[in-house]
């Protein structure tokens, strides 16, 4: 699963053609292209493809196509301004090359955003030109021979070095690294701001100047004078003088939901409209600034902690919304502690962002769902980089000990197993990617090969034409799942009960097929890897039903006072 500071600033902006970043750890493998070069190449090919296809769809010049793309982008985050800066810098050469029938691969190699290092294979997304690659590239370089652009591109210049963008880039980078809200006046890890790790990720603060006021805490003096736990229930019933919090919530077993996850749990999503020329319009990019400041994640629509109405038209709700429906006293008590690229190995770097006080707060349901990155990487040989069962045991035990020292007594922890990711190749490899649908010139197999060649694939092991490698990856995933299962069966902790649940994606596929759907419709169309919103909500439904059947004590009681809470407090202040 992606760990993309570079993709965050390049692909989503569509303009990250020369960005350098430090979000991903340095790699000791010198044979691997630098992450900066790999992601920059992907960003360039994506942008040039969109420009070329916009010209085709609208029967316009390349110049008009570039201007059209910029006109679609919002002013927020200087997206439109940055787009015009890029056109000014690179536009004339892109026009010359596309006018000479060079494809996006050739354009990006000519402008040196893609580079073939000595001894390395040629990485290309589209079919190779009919003439030899060497001849085509020489021809393209002659076309732009006198251009000052190549000097600029070689300099490694960073879009974030532009004064207008420096602060924005820094904000996003800080939020990603620390996994706590950037805007948090009282430093209680809760915010009144939605993105940059704000209330899209954890319940909205209702008093950002008082660190003792935050979602999930036990009420202070039954919230007679203020709403100390932000669930929208406070004050005193004038009829009998009993505090509403005491009347409606005492003994109802309130609890929160906390997800420790990766990009799947955070709901990584790149909208197909952003790269599909035939669907592109002024409305396509309205939500791009929000997505950028959420690291291309959509936790507000995720299966675990989503609180907004689904955008995909199915009736299933997130686990958090089901907990709220069961007991309205649980309002706003959710935390999505997920990061792109997270695994059992690096969870310790951001688990401190979890907010729970053993004494002051209600118990929590914690879902540990590191479902991919312990077997996934972009390395040319991904098998040695996979987490071993022994190392997973050590990592998870360290996490559980941390949870035991922070969670209130009566909490519950569920360890999620890993999926069998062979369904990705099986269901997508021969289908056209959104970028390839217009001209029927690019399948998911080509996308996977391109990303693997650049060593920026989110999961080389499963996104590979090599069946043996796909099988090995699934075998290791099964071994790790069995390790989690053994931990749940044998380990005991004082402050929480421990459970294990299979990541039963095959059951989700079967359920979707019963409704007339196809398996490929459950996968994110742009990256061809992550479960999409439909899949995440179906997984939440599967989780809820299994827990209800096997471990109903995890969910707490149904609150008989829910109707009265709604009558007195309406939507409880919303989310």
From Swiss-Prot:
The record's section on InterPro entries has: AOAH, AOAH_Saposin_N, GDSL, Saposin-like, SaposinB_dom, SGNH_hydro_sf
Extract the ranges annotated as region (Important for enzyme activity, localization to cytoplasmic vesicles, and protein stability).
38-70
- List ligand-binding residues for Ca(2+) 2: 186, 188, 205, 207, 210, 213
**Annotated S-S bridges:** 41-114, 44-108, 70-83, 123-453, 160-169, 206-230, 249-329, 376-459
Sorted alphabetically, the keyword list is: Calcium, Cytoplasmic vesicle, Disulfide bond, Glycoprotein, Hydrolase, Lipid metabolism, Metal-binding, Secreted, Signal, Zymogen
- The residues annotated as the active site are 263
E.C. numbers:
3.1.1.77
Cofactor note (record):
Binds 3 Ca(2+) ions per subunit. The calcium ions probably have a structural role.
Q: What's the domain of life for this entry?
A: Eukaryota
What cofactor does this protein call for?
Answer: Ca(2+)
Q: What is the effect of changing residue 372 to M?
A: Loss of enzyme activity with lipopolysaccharide, due to steric hindrance. No effect on activity with small, synthetic substrate
Site feature location: Interacts with lipopolysaccharide: 345
UniProt activity-regulation remark: Inhibited by EDTA.
Catalytic activity entry: a 3-(acyloxy)acyl derivative of bacterial toxin + H2O = a 3-hydroxyacyl derivative of bacterial toxin + a fatty acid + H(+)
Return the CDD domains for the record: acyloxyacyl_hydrolase_like (cd01826)
The GO molecular function terms of this record are: acyloxyacyl hydrolase activity; calcium ion binding
- What's the reported outcome of changing residue 263 to A? Loss of enzyme activity
Protein's GO biological process: fatty acid metabolic process; lipopolysaccharide catabolic process; negative regulation of inflammatory response
- How does this polypeptide assemble, per the annotation? Heterodimer of the large and small subunits; disulfide-linked.
Q: What is the name of this protein?
A: Acyloxyacyl hydrolase
Output the lineage of the source organism.
Answer: Eukaryota, Metazoa, Chordata, Craniata, Vertebrata
